[in-house]
Amino acid sequence: MSKKLTFQEIILTLQQYWNDQGCMLMQAYDNEKGAGTMSPYTFLRAIGPEPWNAAYVEPSRRPADGRYGENPNRLYQHHQFQVVMKPSPSNIQELYLASLEKLGINPLEHDIRFVEDNWENPSTGSAGLGWEVWLDGMEITQFTYFQQVGGLATSPVTAEVTYGLERLASYIQEVDSVYDIEWAPGVKYGEIFLQPEYEHSKYSFEMSDQDMLLENFEKFEKEASRALEEGLVHPAYDYVLKCSHTFNLLDARGAVSVTERTGYIARIRNLARVVAKTFVAERKKLGFPLLDEATRAILLAEDDE
């Protein structure tokens, strides 16, 4: 490995590489979420017949993982670089390995392993065949071929590549703590994120108002359902994301029992499934505009029979 890229140079390198592979460069979605997969740029676009190739950075919040900034590798909020390609290219793994080379990691000089780890997200009714990618013994990426999203079978199959940017940067820069990562020349990761990490951890574990969160969950759930009754998919999905984050805050606070936890997840999943079905129906009414004309004509003709 030659030059040690800064955090932002890693992002810029990945953006340029995946742009060259035909991916649109999207921006982070402006709602709290636990993973890049939950962005509508993945969750909604992975279903239905239309092609979709996109890449974006997604800050991901996981309240239960907060450690007050005292753990060098476990965070309330981390950053993922998300790539989704639909239909999945037959050479997606080769494309991924080539992206590592762009970051200065020669696959021939390192121990890179694809370790089977099938993926599931119960709260969104999503699952797929998956692998963790290990670089010299450290997981840096999750690879998934979606089989189901929002309770719907995916066709064509979407490939998802999720880079853990903090882990990748720690490896490239050879640092033991994420807070020592160089974000930009002369600016460390900790100088930007250590204080927010401490404050969000304190809030999540000690300060959050449980009664307010419980009330908010109910309100967000009702508002999602109300939006869906009017066929408003995207506002509804925003409220599904709010339900998910609110539940994660309640879970971190220890405010839900094991039995209640299952119930909350089921409620979020039920909403997500309705969102998914409504989205596909909405795209069909529009004539699946991202499809080429020949494929669109065949699909719409089949549905008319």
Curated annotation (Swiss-Prot):
Sequence similarity: Belongs to the class-II aminoacyl-tRNA synthetase family.
GO molecular function, one term: transferase activity
Signal peptide: none
PROSITE patterns tied to this protein: AA_TRNA_LIGASE_II_GLYAB
Species this protein is from: Streptococcus pyogenes serotype M18 (strain MGAS8232)
Stated name of the protein: Glycine--tRNA ligase alpha subunit
Reactions catalysed: tRNA(Gly) + glycine + ATP = glycyl-tRNA(Gly) + AMP + diphosphate
Subcellular location: Cytoplasm
Biological process annotations from GO: glycyl-tRNA aminoacylation
Complex formation: Tetramer of two alpha and two beta subunits.
Top-tier EC class: ligase
The enzyme's E.C. designation: 6.1.1.14
